[in-house]
A protein has these predicted regions:
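Conserved hydrophobic beta-strand positions in leucine-rich repeat
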Residues: 21, 41, 61-63, 81-83, ...
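N-terminal capping/linker segments that flank leucine-rich repeat
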Residues: 1-50, 58-60, 226-296
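Ankyrin-repeat and related helical/solenoid repeat scaffolds used for protein-protein interactions
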Residues: 168, 173-233
Length: 296
């Protein structure tokens, strides 16, 4: 259903006691009305293709599972906005007091400036390649299933889900982090893991170097040096054993890498010397009476 002039102009009506707002549209038997109580307006799964101008006073606006491609200016009073599973290609400027933004499963290529009050940002399943600067108040960031190539500096997050992107590295992780999901990226190494981390999912990455795992890590899903590991309800002793094994693997790989490097260097040196000692370059030294042995 479209909230548009073809069905009659929508309008807002405020109750006499100022405790609720109603939106109505359509004509005759097709008229529909939705009320909001205590500043909460739920328009989920109503087939909407557009919205009328929104009045002030709305604190929580839920627009999930519609067919919206854009939103009108948002009321400055808004604290919660959920607009998942629409066709949004952009968002309007966000109110300064907004705390929760859920815009999953749209067609967003960028996000507007995030308000300093934002606590939760969920923007999974979009077309994002970058994120704006993250506010210091942010606690939960869910940005998986996008095309993000790098993350901005992270505030004191509790949960970070950046799975299924195109990340080559992660920024330093905050000490407050409890859960990290970075599955299916292009990560070759992980930064130092916070001591409070409880959940780590990092499968489907070509990780070559692992930091020590936190002692209190409870859930682990990763690919270590070609070995797939999935652990649940781990103990500090088990984590210590894994760390010991990983250090051993790392040392072995470093030694093998050193040997491969020396072998490659020997080949490169031989190829270089073949060019340097080509007859056309050697002849001038012989003519000058220079002993070639002194140059080896």
């Amino acid at each position: 259903m479209s909230v548009s002039s073809s069905e009659g102009p929508p309008w807002w009506e405020e109750s006499e006691d100022n405790t609720s707002l109603s939106i109505s549209w359509g004509r005759g038997v097709g008229t529909r009305s939705v009320s909001t109580c205590n500043g909460k307006l739920n328009l989920t799964d109503m087939g909407l293709t557009e919205l009328p101008p929104l009045p002030e006073g709305i604190l929580e606006l839920r627009l999930d599972k519609n067919h919206l491609i854009s939103l009108p200016p948002l009321p400055s009073s808004l604290l919660v906005l959920t607009c998942t599973r629409n066709h949004l290609i952009s968002l309007p400027p966000l109110p300064e007091g907004l705390r929760f933004l859920l815009c999953n499963s749209n067609q967003l290529r960028s996000l507007p400036t995030l308000p300093s009050s934002l606590q939760v940002l969920e923007c999974d399943y979009n077309l994002l390649t970058t994120l704006p600067e993250l506010p210091a108040s942010l606690e939960e960031l869910m940005c998986g299933k996008n095309r993000i190539t790098s993350l901005p500096s992270l505030p004191d997050l509790i949960e970070l889900d950046c799975a299924c992107n195109q990340l080559l590295s992660l920024p330093p992780l905050p000490a407050s982090l409890r859960s990290l999901d970075c599955v299916a990226n292009h990560l070759r190494w992980l930064p130092a893991l916070p001591e409070r981390l409880c959940v780590l999912y990092c499968k489907e990455n070509p990780i070559e170097t692992f930091p020590d795992l936190p002692r209190d890590l409870g859930y682990l899903m990763c690919d270590m040096y070609g070995i797939s590991i999935e652990l649940e309800d781990t103990t500090p002793e088990g984590i210590q054993q894994i760390n010991t094994q990983m250090r051993g693997w790392t040392e072995l790989l470093e030694q093998q890498s050193k040997e491969r490097c020396m072998a490659r260097c020997a080949i490169y040196k031989e190829q270089i010397m073949m060019v340097v000692w080509h007859p056309t370059r050697v002849a001038p030294f012989i003519e000058r009476g220079i002993d070639l042995e002194d140059m080896m």
